[in-house]
UniProtKB/Swiss-Prot annotation:
It comes from Haemophilus influenzae (strain PittEE). It is found in: Cytoplasm. Pfam families: EF-G_D2 (PF22042), GTP_EFTU (PF00009), GTP_EFTU_D2 (PF03144), IF-2 (PF11987), IF2_assoc (PF08364), IF2_N (PF04760). Its main location: cytoplasm. The keyword GTP-binding applies. Transmembrane segments: none annotated. One of the essential components for the initiation of protein synthesis. Protects formylmethionyl-tRNA from spontaneous hydrolysis and promotes its binding to the 30S ribosomal subunits. Also involved in the hydrolysis of GTP during the formation of the 70S ribosomal complex. It comes from the Bacteria. This is Translation initiation factor IF-2. Residues 18-27 have a biased composition (Low complexity). Residues 335-505 form the tr-type G domain.
Amino acid sequence: MLRLMRQKKLSIQRRTKTTVSSTTTGGKSKEVQVEVRKKRTVKTDIAQQEEAKLKAQQEAEAKKIAEQKAIEEKARLEAEKVAAKKEADEKVKAETAKPVKSAVDSKVKSVDPEKEKRKAEEAELRRKAEELARQKAEEQARRAAEEAKRYAEADDSDNESSSEDYSDYNLSSRYALEAEDEEDRRNENRGRGKNKVAKAKKGGRDDENSKNSKNERESNRKNQKDAKFGKGKNGKKGAALQQAFTKPAQVVKSDVVIGETITVAELANKMAVKATEIIKMMMKMGEMVTINQVIDQETAQLVAEELGHKVILRNENELEEAVLGDRDVNAEKVTRAPVVTIMGHVDHGKTSLLDYIRKAKVAAGEAGGITQHIGAYHVEMDDGKMITFLDTPGHAAFTSMRARGAKATDIVVLVVAADDGVMPQTIEAIQHAKAAGAPLVVAVNKIDKPEANLDRVEQELLQHDVISEKFGGDVQFVPVSAKKGTGVDDLLDAILLQSEVLELTAVKDGMASGVVIESYLDKGRGPVATILVQSGTLRKGDIVLCGFEYGRVRAMRDENGKEVDEAGPSIPVELLGLSGVPAAGDEATVVRDEKKAREVALYRQGKFREVKLARQQKAKLENMFSNMSEGDVAELNVIVKADVQGSVEAIVQALNELSTNEVKVKVVGSGVGGITETDATLATASNAIIVGFNVRADATARRVIEAENIDLRYYSIIYELLNEIKAAMSGMLEPEFKQEIIGLAEVRDVFRHPKFGAIAGCMVTEGVVKRNNPIRVLRDNVVIFEGELESLRRFKDDVSEVRNGMECGIGVKNYNDVKVGDQIEVFEVVEVKRSI
């Protein structure tokens, strides 16, 4: 019971002692000690009990509702499950009874198939409906459970808020009690105010002294603490806390790791110097750089060593070397077929000769007699020997393509027309062959023509160090006629003889490697690359790393478009399955791991971007001062799209060579494949013309081109393209002005006029003198004044022009020193059209 009382009540007891002054009967003052006792009992637990009771009641109600709902839902689900089971049992019974019934019915009558089908459909529909109903019931049950849960949570939150209210009430009541106590205390002390003041006065000095001594103690303690930690006026820092950094007298030398490329800022960081120091150093070395400029390894090494650091060169392409090193190429070498490149001047009969050899009419399809793409074909001889031919274009613009063809080749067949002799591209072909170190075989074509002169060809080639066997050299000269087929067999024999001398061998078994002859983007097949296999055997399914691209070989086709599963050395094939269009001339290598091949390709792309950026920045810095001094140069923006990579390169190179000091051709975009909407949008943004070489614009691109009035031009022959671009550039040239003399008048007499000053009486000796044209005054055929006419009169009339043989009066504006015998020359400024 006592515990219960303690829980319900809280008793507060307080004793207060005070002194009361009173006067006795004798008149004397007497102080009496009085003790006041107070007791207060506070009920504390009633509100908490009520709160707990209410909370328990609400929780019980919420729990009861949730349980009731769950029981109802469970009962309903059980009922549905029983019904579904019953229906399934009935269905099974019906299905088991069906064969018996059908057997009985078959004796009486034949089964109606339509009826059976309908019944099956009805059963299927019924099953679906039951499934749907079951899903719906489950969904409703889930929702009901969530709703009950939500109600329960809401009740809990309400209970919490009510309990907070109660706690606030208790807190506030406690504060009220404390306030009451404070008030009582003040009332009790009010009667002692006088004595208290007296005591304060009496002990005021002592209190003040104690306060001062306390302040002194605190300040002393603080000073001691400050002195300990090195603070305050007289504080000296401890040895452990003193900063002992002194600037080093010389730069700290360290090892600097430099990759293949590095920015100036990164190099400065690695050497722990300011970037300005490096920029100054490079300016002394004659190089202008910015803080973010990429510099190559050699330059960075030179700068670091100049500043006294030790350089460690890092090889960044370790992964590439590891991937390319992990290849099975140790097989035995066997004799391979020679790769022959046919070179020569335009229309000297290269493609016709190759066509005769292949016995297939491909030359007729070449536009304007120029081979547009590198064609790669292999032919088999009667004795089983094989020769692979590369046909390179002859036009000067395709120099890069021809150089690429020479890199992949073993023997160069130089075709020279017997009636035409050595031409510019013939000389270029000789230079390419020499640069590639490939031996020459000269095919003197068109010997069936009456004006053919074999000796003349030999003499002209002699001037370019191509010495025939007749003159004691080692170059075979074979006279042929591509039209009639004369001497073609002799040419093939000469090629095979030359290949035997070279002793050409390659690994046949093992992982393949080769070179990209041509590449383009096919709309249906994706990136297509023509690859000449140089060693190993390329098989379907191999993983190929090719320049910046990689991929698995999905399909291979030979030059006739026939599917092949493998290709050995010296065999050209079209390959599908690369991630993008590789650049012509890229090396194609078969590797083991596709993931590593992808990493190498991405690394190469990043490296190429860095090098390109470095080149651009260098060009910008080099051209900075020249651009500042020059005026604005007219720019002709061009977007080039072609069917193959080789053509794109050749056209871009030719267009860049057309640029002059006044008009610059800027290729803002180029690529392989048809003209797309992106190209049209770029042309709009950069105010460019679009050039399509053997490609066309798609429907969306045409709509943009028509809407924006973009200049779109299609070509199939490179001569026409270059001529039209020249014409467009000519239109952008600053016009040239020329002065043309239209009349000459001789001064016969001079009159004075009060208004016009000196008036020259003249005879027109040549042409026409016009009133509004500029004039020159000549004395002894020397120009002494240039200006304009103020008046032109014939007798008393003002006229606009005076013709040859007539007299007139001429007043020259702002010039009065006209004398007899002077000549007045009238001219006009004519604009002359310029061309490149």
